[in-house]
Amino acid sequence: MHGVSQQSLARFATRAQKLAGVSGDVAVLITGSREIQQLNRRFRGKNKPTDVLSFPREEGGDIAICADIAHANADRFGHPAASEMKVLILHGMLHLAGYDHETDNGRMEEKEALLRARLNLPASLIQRTQNLASKVAGAKTGLPASHRRAKSIAATNKKKTKKRTRA
């Protein structure tokens, strides 16, 4: 697996499962771009490869990780491929635990940051996506990153206030 120890990933998956609070059996599949694209198309209706997919069951579940994307991201972000795969395993475990970063108002992001620090892992998927979006927004607005973050936080707080007043 391109210099990544299966035993090391298996030990990490067991530890991440406990820390994420996932009971039952969890299987982790390390696969290639073509296979993960087929899974993504079949189960999510998206005909493109992705880095990680999670399939929860009543207890436990399955996680599929694309080794090709993991290696490319590791190169891109300057850390070992094993670290990238661990980030993906942790992300998948949190989905199996019921977290959903698309709908949970930052709960998954907070939990992932806490566990990443505890496990000494690099930036999370959520964090990288937000950093990239922030850079793109900054390029469009010309604002420095610190101002964009402050503006984003202010906008988020404004939305929360509006939601409370509607109820």
Predicted features and spans:
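An acidic/histidine-cluster motif and surrounding catalytic segment
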Residues: 1-85, 94-167
